[in-house]
């Protein structure tokens, strides 16, 4: 789940590193 969000955020180019 975390990996998916990380991949999506990275694909979108968002400054998200670790969602609370």
Swiss-Prot record:
An individual GO BP term: tricarboxylic acid cycle
EC code(s) of this entry: 2.3.3.16
> In which organism is this protein found?
Populus euphratica
Q: Which family does it belong to?
A: Belongs to the citrate synthase family.
**Leftover remarks:** Citrate synthase is found in nearly all cells capable of oxidative metabolism.
Q: Name one GO molecular function term.
A: citrate synthase activity
Indicate whether Electron transport appears among the record's keywords: no
Out of the domains of life, which is the source?
Eukaryota
Which pathway does it serve? Answer: Carbohydrate metabolism; tricarboxylic acid cycle; isocitrate from oxaloacetate: step 1/2
Which EC class is this protein assigned?
transferase
Listed under catalytic activity are: oxaloacetate + acetyl-CoA + H2O = citrate + CoA + H(+)
The identity of this protein, by name, is: Citrate synthase
- Which keywords describe this protein according to UniProt? Transferase, Tricarboxylic acid cycle
Record keyword Transferase present? yes
Which cysteines share a disulfide bond?
A: none
Subunit comment: Homodimer.
